[in-house]
């Protein structure tokens, strides 16, 4: 015969997985068109030249080039892509 009362069960112990947000390509890194530069919720970082914005505010490169981050007068960070110069053949 058991001499222990039944223990209660906890209702805690769950957590959701991280969303993998953040900067994927940093300043001066080379990107090819279509590369994701930043995954974000809302437009924390604003789009600049040669970048597109996805439905979920993901910023991605529209052209091959180098990533450039800049801080504008209003204090917002903008990201753009400087196109690579065409190689002389």
Swiss-Prot record:
Keyword vocabulary terms for this entry: Ribonucleoprotein, Ribosomal protein
Record GO biological process: translation
Pfam families with a match to the protein in the record: Ribosomal_L27
InterPro entries the UniProt entry points to: Ribosomal_bL27, Ribosomal_bL27_CS
Biased composition (Basic and acidic residues): 12-22
Disulfide-bonded cysteines: none
An example molecular function term from Gene Ontology annotations: structural constituent of ribosome
One of the record's GO cellular component terms: cytosolic large ribosomal subunit
Keyword Phosphoprotein tagged: no
Region feature (Disordered): 1-22
NCBIfam families in UniProt: L27
Similarity comment: family membership: Belongs to the bacterial ribosomal protein bL27 family.
Name of the protein in question: Large ribosomal subunit protein bL27
Organism from which the protein derives: Acidiphilium cryptum (strain JF-5)
């Amino acid at each position: 015969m058991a001499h222990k009362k039944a223990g209660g069960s906890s209702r805690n112990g769950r957590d959701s997985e991280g969303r993998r947000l953040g900067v994927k390509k940093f300043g001066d890194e080379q990107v090819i068109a279509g590369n994701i530069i930043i995954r974000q919720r809302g437009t924390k970082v604003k789009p600049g030249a040669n970048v597109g914005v996805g439905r979920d505010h993901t910023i991605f490169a529209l052209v091959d080039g180098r990533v450039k981050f800049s801080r504008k007068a209003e204090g917002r960070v903008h990201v753009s892509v400087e196109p690579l110069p065409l190689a002389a053949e």
